Design a protein with these regions (language model features):
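Class I SAM-dependent methyltransferase SAM/SAH-binding core
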Residues: 46-91
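A C-terminal cap/extension of S-adenosyl-L-methionine-dependent methyltransferases
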Residues: 145-149, 178-221
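A short glycine-rich, Lys/Arg-flanked "PGG" loop and its adjoining helix->strand segment in the class I
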Residues: 115-127
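Conserved class I S-adenosyl-L-methionine
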Residues: 1-33, 52, 132-157, 191
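Short alpha-helix
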Residues: 157-174, 180
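A conserved beta-strand element that flanks and buttresses the S-adenosyl-L-methionine
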Residues: 103
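Short catalytic micro-motifs in class I SAM-dependent methyltransferases
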Residues: 106-110
Length: 221
C-alpha cells in the first residue's frame, strides 16, 4: 500500500478509470435483475463500480470495503448523495449482512487467506444470493504468471492460485460454483499494457478473451 492507497492516489484514479469496460462486461454476465438490490463490493477501491451500479442498474443500496483508507475517503466523497456506504476494512465489516449480491474484481489473487474470505462472503449473503468474482491474475494465465513473478515481493502477493484452487475453496465453503469468460466487445488498446513486460496487443487480447474469467459462487437457497 502506498500513501494510504493501493498503488498511490494518482495510480488508483487511473486504474479505476481504466476498469469501465471490464465492469460493463461483468454486468453483462449477471443473470439477475439488480434493481432495488442490496449489493456488496469487496475491495471497492474508490467506489467506481458501485457508482456505476447505482447510476445504471438502479440498485437499492451499495456497500463497499477496502483496506486502503485514502481510497475509501475518495469513495465517500465521489458518492455524493448516492445510497452508498464505504468502510476501511480487510474483510466484510462487522454487522454487514443481508446482501442480495456481491462482487469483486481482481481481489482474490491478493488474499493470503482465501478460505476466510469465502466464509465471510458466505455469511454476508442471503440464501440464494450469488457472489460474482472476476480474476485474471492466476497461475493458468501465462501473461499474469510473469506479472506475478515480477511483483510478488513488492505487493506481498500469495500464490499465484490456479482456477481449480479458487473453485475448490469456495465449493468447500458451501457455494455452488460456476465460471465463465467475460463477454468483451472492444478492448481499449492502452488498457494495462504498461503493467507487464509483454505489451503486445495480441497477448492482451488473449488475456481478456481467454484468461480473465468471472466466477459465480451461489449460496444455496
Amino acid at each position: 500500500m502506498v500513501d494510504r492507497y493501493w498503488r498511490g492516489s494518482a495510480q488508483d484514479e487511473v486504474m479505476q478509470d481504466e476498469h469501465g469496460f471490464i465492469w460493463r462486461a461483468m454486468l453483462d454476465m449477471v443473470d439477475a435483475d439488480l434493481s432495488g438490490s442490496k449489493v456488496l463490493d469487496a475491495g471497492c477501491n474508490r467506489g467506481g463500480f458501485l457508482r456505476l451500479l447505482s447510476d445504471e442498474a438502479s440498485i437499492g443500496e451499495g456497500f463497499g470495503y477496502d483496506p486502503a483508507p485514502g481510497a475509501i475517503e475518495d469513495a465517500r466523497r465521489l458518492a455524493g448523495t448516492l445510497p452508498l456506504t464505504f468502510e476501511t476494512s480487510e474483510s466484510v465489516p462487522q454487522g454487514w449482512s443481508g446482501f442480495d449480491v456481491a462482487f469483486s474484481h481482481e481481489v482474490l489473487y491478493l488474499l493470503h487467506d482465501l478460505p476466510s474470505h469465502a466464509t465471510a462472503i458466505y455469511g454476508s449473503l442471503v440464501p440464494g444470493a450469488s457472489y460474482f468474482a472476476t480474476i485474471g491474475v492466476h497461475a493458468d494465465s501465462a501473461l499474469m504468471t510473469t506479472w506475478h513473478d515480477d511483483n510478488a515481493i513488492a505487493l506481498d502477493l500469495p500464490g499465484p492460485y490456479r482456477l481449480d484452487d479458487v473453485a475448490g475453496v469456495f465449493k468447500a465453503t458451501g457455494f455452488d460454483v460456476a465460471v465463465g469468460r467475460l463477454p468483451f466487445r472492444f478492448v481499449p488498446v492502452d488498457a494495462h499494457r504498461g503493467d507487464v513486460t509483454d505489451s503486445r496487443l495480441s497477448s492482451w487480447l488473449d488475456y481478456y478473451s481467454r484468461d480473465k474469467v468471472m466466477f459465480r459462487f451461489s449460496k444455496p437457497g
